[in-house]
A protein has these predicted regions:
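Bacterial N-terminal signal peptides that target proteins for export
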Residues: 1-10
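Bacterial N-terminal signal peptides
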Residues: 10-20
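Sec-dependent signal peptide cleavage junction
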Residues: 20-31
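Acidic, polar low-complexity linker/tail segments
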Residues: 26, 34-98, 105-112
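C-terminal "exit" segments of structured domains
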Residues: 48, 251-286
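Von Willebrand factor
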Residues: 90-147, 152-198, 227-228, ...
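VWA/integrin I-like adhesion module and closely mimicked acidic/polar interface patches used
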Residues: 198-266
């Protein structure tokens, strides 16, 4: 298989043609109808292979089966080119969890170590082939664990993280993650999910971080991205949470692990379309 990268943007559109099951056809990455919704999670390209991961939910929030989606006649277009939809299946590829932990000293030590315990719950529940890439963010952005599926190494690295002075620089974090993804694209698991974990106290003193809560980080790094905000006053952030459409998760430190596992269960409901990219589009930025 030729190892090329194809740059994609919102020109990649998933259309559902048999509308009896899904209501009105939807364009761009998110579609809603009275009968249900679909949301594109990520596109993975390893030319000529192109995989599209997405969610198709009914009106009650339950996932449609691959058979129903296939029967609906999905169409995939890249710009003005229609791509062949070979099959629709439950997504089974491993996931690379890209986790950024706020290790600032201004977080209460008890909260910080509870946060680390929550991450351990996520590691416990990860599949054997899933990967973890771990960043710390206080003072400077550092990748303390390159992507690995070695759980012993995950636990060891997590246990070595200490609190330091400084605050999170979200612009630097996003830049570092994007750069790392591009340099190790083929070595990482096909599916990727970014998660930022921080404390409400940090947000109230860091306007750049506050702005990040109101933005869609996934648009900047090309994958699903979620921010976990530990707080015992969720009402302060309810407006932001509503606007974030599931990207912002409010929780107490004690329930962080449960929330991370919930997200993992949600990721397990994704569907996948496999297709191929025409050779004429190899290497193009669209």
């Amino acid at each position: 298989m030729r190892q090329h990268k194809l740059w994609l943007c919102a020109l990649l559109v998933l259309l559902l043609a048999a509308l009896g099951a899904f209501g009105a056809a939807a364009e761009t990455t998110v579609g809603m109808s009275g009968a249900g919704s679909f949301k594109m999670e990520q596109v993975y390209v390893n030319v000529p292979e192109l995989d599209v991961y997405f969610y198709a939910l009914d009106g009650d929030g339950n996932s449609y089966s691959p058979i129903k989606v296939q029967a609906a006649g999905p169409e995939l277009t890249l710009g003005d080119r229609r791509l062949e939809v070979r099959s629709v299946a439950a997504a089974s590829d491993p996931i690379c969890y890209i986790l950024a932990l706020d290790n600032s000293k201004s977080i209460e030590p008890s909260e910080f170590y509870t946060m680390l315990g929550g991450v351990r719950k996520l590691i416990n529940a990860m599949g054997d082939d899933d990967q973890l890439m771990l960043y710390t963010t206080a003072g400077s952005t550092e990748c303390v664990l390159p992507a690995t599926s070695d759980k012993n190494l995950m636990y060891k690295t997590l246990g070595s993280i200490k609190q330091v002075e400084g605050s999170m620089d979200t612009a630097r974090l996003i830049s570092a993650v994007y750069s790392e993804l591009q340099s190790d694209y083929q070595a990482l698991a096909p599916r990727k999910a970014a998660m930022i974990v921080t404390d409400a106290g940090q947000v109230l003193t860091n306007m750049a971080l506050f702005a990040t809560l109101a933005s869609d980080v996934s648009d900047q790094i090309g994958m699903a991205a979620y921010i976990y905000l530990m707080t015992d006053r969720p009402g302060v952030f309810e407006t932001l949470e509503s606007a974030a459409d599931g990207r912002l998760v409010l929780c107490e430190a004690l329930t962080l692990g449960d929330e991370l596992k919930k997200k993992q269960e949600y990721l397990a409901t994704a569907l996948e379309i496999k297709t191929e990219v025409p050779e004429s589009l190899y290497g193009e930025r669209l």
